[in-house]
């Protein structure tokens, strides 16, 4: 008898610190460990595991990507709840337009949803107190999940 945990498959594209892009599938659990509802890509990036398991196209085996060497991850054809929880997708906070430069010098423009009280709503306060290593950067083309350790600079455009 084979026992298996049901999972959701999500297509992702990952940029690593060596400048290589990888496209593959990430498998998410139906129930998250840290909140109500299904596990999200951001949950997987910010959990305590050192490696992110991804299945590359045409391969049966899983490739393990060291999270410390992931610069950013883009969710392909995202459905609501795939990348972020519904609370995180609700852009109810202050929208902060930013220009972000990440290793190896790539530049992104987008915005952050600053979910913070007025007294702690400066960009520096918000970025420095984000939980986990990864945070969402909303852009016109996609949602980018950025590794804070790979950010060279963030500039407010507001």
Regions found by a protein language model. Give the residues of each.
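Conserved RNA-binding domains used in RNP assembly and mRNA/RNA metabolism
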Residues: 1-158
